[in-house]
């Protein structure tokens, strides 16, 4: 099985490179749950980078999933990731609209909030 050498700094570097900053919820894990932080980095690395889909489509898919869960905060995170991976605003909007058949029109409002929050930055 693959071996991964992650320490706290490598984990922080990962999030700094993805977000451009260290989110508060990551900071909570750094000192109090370093093994959970390592696992979270490995899960993200596999799901976002080491799969058959390109990063733009992974981020768009995660916009859909998070909109279906009414999660505007994480729609924002992944909409920004999709932008960084080359997605157009129309593709991001369409990815959130794809949640409607699963979660209903109510998924549009938090999804739209997440999209617009990222545009404001």
Stretches with model-predicted labels:
Residues 23, 58-62, 90-97:
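Non-catalytic, well-ordered alpha-helical scaffold segments
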Residues 30, 51, 69-72, 86, ...:
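Residues at alpha-helix boundaries and short interhelical turns
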Residues 1-57, 84, 110-121:
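Acidic, glycine/proline-rich low-complexity segments that act as flexible tails and inter-domain linkers
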Residues 58-72:
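Amphipathic, charged-and-aliphatic alpha-helical interface segments
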Residues 87-121:
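C-terminal binding/interaction regions
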Residues 42, 64-66, 98-101:
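Residues within well-ordered alpha-helical secondary structure of globular protein domains
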């Amino acid at each position: 099985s693959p071996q991964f050498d992650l320490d706290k700094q490598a984990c922080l570097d990962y999030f700094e490179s993805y977000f451009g900053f260290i989110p508060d919820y990551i900071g909570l894990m750094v000192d109090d749950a370093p093994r959970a932080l390592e696992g979270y980095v490995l899960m993200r690395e596999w799901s976002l980078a080491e799969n058959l889909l390109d990063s733009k489509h992974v981020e768009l898919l995660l916009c859909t999933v998070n909109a279906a869960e009414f999660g505007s905060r994480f729609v924002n995170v992944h909409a920004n990731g999709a932008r960084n991976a080359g997605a157009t605003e129309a593709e991001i909007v369409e990815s959130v609209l794809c949640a409607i058949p699963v979660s209903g029109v109510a998924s549009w409002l938090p999804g739209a909030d997440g999209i617009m929050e990222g545009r404001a930055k």
